[in-house]
Amino acid sequence: MLRRAASNAYSWWWASHVRTKQSKWLEENLQDIEEKVEYALKLLEDEGDSFAKRAEMYYKRRPELISFVEESFKAYRALAERYDHISKELQNANTTIASVFPDQVPEFAMNEDDDDDAPVSPRHHKNKTSNKNVPKVPDLPIKDPEAAKKMFMSRKAIQEQNASSVVNKSGLSKTEAVEEIDKLQKEILVLQTEKEFVKTSYENGLAKYWEIEKCIMEKQGKVSSLQDEFDEGAVVIEDKEAQILMSTTALKSCQEKLEELRDKQEQNVKEVDVSRKQISESTEEFGNLSDALLGDGKGNHEIYSEKEKLESLGEKVNDEFDDSEAKSCLTIPDVADKIDELVNDVINLENLFSSQAALIHRLREEIDDLKAQIRALQKENNSSQTDDNMDMGKKLKEMEEKVNGVKDIDQEVEEKSDNIDKHLTRAHMKLSFLSKRLKSLTQEGEDEELKATNVPIQDIGSLTDTKFPEENIDDTVVSENALDIKSASEVVFAEKDLSDEVNQEEAIETKTKEASLSDLEKHISSPKSDIITTQESSDELFLQKLLAHGIEGREKHLLTEYTKVLRNYKEVKKLLHETETKLKNVNTLKDEGKDQQRGQLFMLICREDNNATNAITGQKQRMSPNEEQLGARVDALLSENLNLLVRFSNSFGKIQQFDTGIKDLHGEMLKIIKQKNQDGGKNTLRSNVRPIYKHLSEIRTEMTVWLEKSLLLKEEINIRASTLSDIHNEITEALKTDSEDSEIKFTIYQGAKFEGEVSNMKKENNRIAEELQTGLDQVTKLMKDADTTLEKLSEEFSLSESNTQSSQDRSRIPLRSFIFDRKPKKQRLSLFSCIQPSLSKMKKPAGS
């Protein structure tokens, strides 16, 4: 990436030479315009021989040509603007070069007319100009003495004369201009490097963005498929839960990014330390060289001195981290706002890292340049013993300025590194504070289950009665402890204010631990509980060590304590699972015993029923003749009832057919009426209305027949109802009489059986009568609708049943006999007229 930045440092020079092979934009535009011109020529070459081709050329190809002209104008406009911009830049560059290097102005003028694509170095230009500017022998003697004087002047004198004649627009001398150009080029290089770093981070962030977007789309598709599969609606997440989830995710992302930036900072610090060692070595060499050359002991041996820090970085940040932030985070939305500020701080930190990387890269290059100059000066000192002290002093002064410049860059790197450390520490403090505050707010709004999962040490004895989600305990405890350890390792000074509270918490934890162990011994009496009780002595020793250590390493001790409690919890949960399985086995055994008892009881009931049926059948064999006669009547009524149900179901099913047929005809009729209102032609639509009219008349006739049959069925049902009531009265009277006549008397079982069958038939008969009456009402309503529809059709389209029949039965006169006056042949009698002569007699008067 640094090589790419170095290669792009002078890209402005090559971009100024706008040529076809070097400008990708211009080449693409030329290819695009060439393709468009070819397409436009093809459109213009077509000849409109027919009207269709001319219409196509006008309506289809004319807009294409117009769009081609517009696009060509836009392309020309863009090309002209780019040319105008580049010409201004070239003009400014030429004026600057002419003011700084006046002797190379003719060479650049020649380069403008050169058509070669490859850039030519200044050496080649000088060789070409020197070869081309060789003076030739003049044909005539020179009359102008000034011109002759200039011919014999040296080139250096001519250049000095031209330089003195040119006025500098910038107001700078040649050396100042060179220094300014060098400075600007270095700044450009730094900006190019920083740009490459920012570009790389942007590309990485963009790739991660699209990866997350793809993951979101996949999960959303899975959610949609599951909702469609199980017919579940969208699950609405509560605002508070959504804010907590988003805040937790943002804090996790910030934590990962801060860890990554912390690693980068450590790497940058190592690189800066290496660079500082090189600076100290170079300054020492420069001091020895200056002592050897000047001998006055004025060399600057102590170039770099590290700035003493009066206050630690943590104390500075602690002063800045005000208590107002803690007071302002009272609700979850306030915490969300603070998290947004933390995200902005992390983004600013990334920008600071990119600028720091550019400065470190510049520092390396300056150190390498300084080393090269010191080596060159040492070689020059060893090779030639010169007496020119002024020249050597000038070089040493330049070298000292170079060293001071490197020191300034190093100081700038150090300040930026301190600033980054300060921002990193503050971001870590914000992260730890916001994470703790978010957890405290979530714990306040939750029930006792969440409190128990977050504080598992306080009540271990209740583990046998309550079920805790294992995953929640592991996640909350481990993440909380990891975050506490990280924040404590990074910000140590924050623990000093909390030492008293920590000691109190540890004392409370020891008491709760002892109480929990005693409760655990009371509640758990299985062999597995020995594993927990054997750890009591080790836990007491551990608590003593925890109190002895004090604040240092309390997070590690608490983490180990939490892991032990979780281990105990898992063992207790395992014991509970085993007891549950035992209870399930006992319950299954009890259920099996109950099933066996139910089976035995059912067998006893079946035996009693068989005995009762045997007794009844024994009584049935001794039935009287009147009972047999009444039983035969009841059986006949049952068969008639079954036949009646079949007839009723067949007739009742036709009601739905009538309804659907009339609805369909109504729909078709409405379409025809709508078409009539739109077109206004009655004769053209009469042929479409006739089949509807005929079909509706047929349905009306069928409904009339159905009504007649249904009325007969209704009378039959009424007769059956009276018969059933008579039989029911006979049975009840026979059961009530206490006469000694054996012909009339019934047994209790047989009388109850006859009475039940007759009552069931009466209920069925009443239900059929009600449904039949409903069907009659519905068919009557349908007949009225059909009559109104037929009347409406006959009025609007002049249709009637007599007209249709007469038009069909009217004897038609052939067209041939009408024209040529021929008598038609006698029509033969059809088979239907022979079979039914009465129909023809009825139709004749209707037609007449």
Curated annotation (Swiss-Prot):
Signal peptide: none annotated. This is Protein NETWORKED 2C. Pfam families: KIP1, NET2A, NET2A_C. Plant-specific actin binding protein. May be part of a membrane-cytoskeletal adapter complex. Belongs to the NET family. Residues 108-141 are annotated as: Disordered. GO terms for molecular function: actin binding. Keywords: Coiled coil. Residues 10-90 form the NAB domain. GO terms for cellular component: membrane. Residues 172-204, 241-278, 305-454, 752-797 form a coiled coil.
